[in-house]
Amino acid sequence: MVFRRRPDKRTPLLTFERILVPLAGTEADEPALRLATLLLAGTEGQASLLHVIEVPFERQLDAEDPAAVAFADEILGKAEAFLTEHGIQVRTGIAQARAAGAAIVDDAAEQRIDLIVMGLRYKKRPGGGWDAGRTVPYVMRNSPAPVWCLRVETEDLANTP
């Protein structure tokens, strides 16, 4: 009896062509970028980076905010450099919206995103509860694509028994 090795034609279990990584400029961004890098490494896939500038209702939605745009450019520039260093194709975007969650969901639908990977800053509430903020729950409820959230361990949590 002769056994021959078949060429490995299996497809990876998880394949994504377009991953959206919303960036807020917090410590929660790095784990999301690292996961997107792992998922897209060695593929023709693309990471779509988005920073949303939330505009308060007191201001016009299209009002210019040079400081916020400069902050967004800095965040997106660093993230783009990290991903391109790892051979990942990158698309970047800045959106102005009243709420970041709606802008993220709209971008995901418009770009036909396969997966959203976002960081979650875990905040404790009195009485032992926790708070995920407004954006992550909104995206999880309304996204046209699967959403993977990575909870970041903050200094507060690291010292909690």
Question: Which residue ranges define each predicted feature?
Answer:
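Glycine-rich, Arg-bearing micro-motifs that act as flexible, cationic patches
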Residues: 118-142, 156-160
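Short, well-ordered secondary-structure micro-motifs
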Residues: 32, 59-62, 103-105, 128-129, ...
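Small/aliphatic-rich secondary-structure junction motif
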Residues: 8-66, 88, 142
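Active-site phosphate/pyrophosphate- and oxyanion-stabilizing loops and adjacent acidic/basic residues
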Residues: 34-37, 105, 137-138
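Structural beta-alpha unit
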Residues: 1-10, 14, 84-116, 121, ...
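Short, solvent-exposed amphipathic alpha-helices that sit
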Residues: 35, 67-79, 103
